[in-house]
């Protein structure tokens, strides 16, 4: 899904680093997969992949399955991880993450 945007080896390393429940850290993950250093356009492409229902927002249920966008058999995030991730990205408090919020979160 991220072909041409991210490197497979980087994705594998990032997923390996957060395999254990409650070990997911969005900043570390974005850095490891190489998203932090990507152009705004590439970050928007990543957003479009994660926004599975194409609503223009990443909702809590999509965040829970965030890792599965990178590898189909990756684990779901725990409720705690999902809520922390949402809180970090949802700067306007509407309960979901828009593309500008996502870009800011990746680049933070």
Swiss-Prot record:
Residues 38-73, 77-108 form the EF-hand domain. GO terms for molecular function: calcium ion binding. Ca(2+) 2 binds at residues 90, 92, 94, 96, 101. Ca(2+) 1 binds at residues 51, 53, 55, 57, 59, 62. The modification N-acetylalanine is found at residue 1. It comes from the Eukaryota. Keywords: Acetylation, Calcium, Metal-binding, Muscle protein, Repeat. The keyword rRNA-binding does not apply. PANTHER family: PARVALBUMIN, PARVALBUMIN ALPHA. In muscle, parvalbumin is thought to be involved in relaxation after contraction. It binds two calcium ions. Belongs to the parvalbumin family. This is Parvalbumin beta. It comes from Cyprinus carpio (Common carp).
């Amino acid at each position: 899904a991220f072909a041409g945007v991210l490197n497979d080896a980087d994705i594998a390393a990032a997923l390996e680093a957060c395999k254990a429940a409650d070990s997911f850290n969005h900043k570390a993950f974005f850095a490891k997969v190489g998203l932090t250093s990507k152009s705004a356009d590439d970050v928007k492409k990543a957003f479009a992949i994660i926004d599975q229902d194409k609503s223009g927002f990443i909702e809590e249920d999509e965040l829970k399955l965030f890792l599965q966008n990178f590898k189909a058999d990756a684990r779901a995030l725990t409720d705690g991880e999902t809520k922390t991730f949402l809180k970090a990205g949802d700067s306007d408090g509407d309960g979901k993450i828009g593309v500008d919020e996502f870009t800011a979160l990746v680049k933070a």
